[in-house]
Design a protein with these regions (language model features):
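Intrinsically disordered, low-complexity terminal regions enriched in charged/polar residues
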Residues: 103-144
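Conserved catalytic cores of phosphodiester-cleaving nucleases, focusing on short active-site segments
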Residues: 15, 43-66
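Nucleic-acid nuclease catalytic cores
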Residues: 82-110
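Active-site metal-binding core of divalent-cation-utilizing nuclease and nuclease-like domains
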Residues: 24-52
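A structural signal for short, well-ordered beta-strand segments and their strand-loop junctions
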Residues: 23-24, 56-58, 92-96
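Acidic-basic catalytic patches of nuclease active cores, encompassing PD-(D/E)XK
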Residues: 1-34
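Mg2+/Mn2+-dependent nuclease catalytic core
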Residues: 62-84
Length: 144
């Protein structure tokens, strides 16, 4: 949990340094309607990008495994994020912290390029994402 919060704070600082317009979304359970509990995962940020428009951002801070892959839990993360995208008609992007850069991938691209795997410890499905399928962003000049 702390690792995720640290990444959110780092991303918030990065947004400020790069002069982006954004909203940081409160993650308290009281701030989200009970109707959506356990069905929708809200993003961490809403980000306004001049060349694209408004997008939702979900920050991740996971370790790269086998030097090339990042994971995303299918049930608790991906399906609930896609429900948010569908309900609010707002594209969701996953942004993974990777040292001094950010790896970006849209939720729709993630499902297209990922390999579905099973976690041997939990028996849960997850998406295995190759880092080559991400867009690397170090500054706002790397975005459209």
């Amino acid at each position: 949990m702390k690792k995720g919060k640290d990444a959110e704070q780092d991303f918030l600082n990065w947004l400020d340094e790069n002069k982006f317009s954004y909203l940081y979304i409160n993650q308290d359970t009281e701030s989200f309607p009970k109707l959506f509990t356990n069905q929708v995962k809200r993003p961490d940020f809403l980000l306004l990008i001049d060349s694209i428009g408004l997008i939702a951002i979900d920050i991740k801070n996971y370790n790269i495994f086998k030097d090339k892959h990042l994971s995303l839990n299918y049930e608790s993360e991906f399906k609930k994020t896609l429900a948010f995208e569908r309900l609010f008609r707002l594209p969701v992007w996953y942004v993974y912290k990777n040292n001094d850069e950010w790896l970006w991938i849209s939720a729709l691209k993630a499902i297209e390029v990922a390999e579905m795997k099973i976690n041997s410890g939990t028996n849960e499905q997850f998406l295995s994402l190759n880092i080559d399928d991400f867009t690397i962003v170090k500054s706002n000049s790397d975005i459209g």
